[in-house]
């Protein structure tokens, strides 16, 4: 079975703290953040539960490489990515469905 990968950026309600991550199951991972599954996590500590940016990859490993690349960059670069895709910093998790893959690629194209 083919496994897609996703790089994502989340923030808090005030858009002051940014969190970058990568996963093979974006819907599930975002729900874990929103439901505060990991009790000692950065996202819980800073109340990060709003998905503001994501990229989809046809190869999962590419998403994890992208995460490393973006994490190494400046906050300004992260904000530029977000603003280009999502200028109003809306919570994109509202658009996600449990069926990923091609659906998420289609959603991402809507924001270009």
PLM ranges: what are they?
Residues 68-82:
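Short arginine-rich
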Residues 26, 59-61, 75:
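Residues at or immediately preceding the N-termini of alpha-helices
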Residues 1-38, 44-54, 65-68, 85-87, ...:
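GIY-YIG nuclease catalytic motif and its immediate N-terminal context
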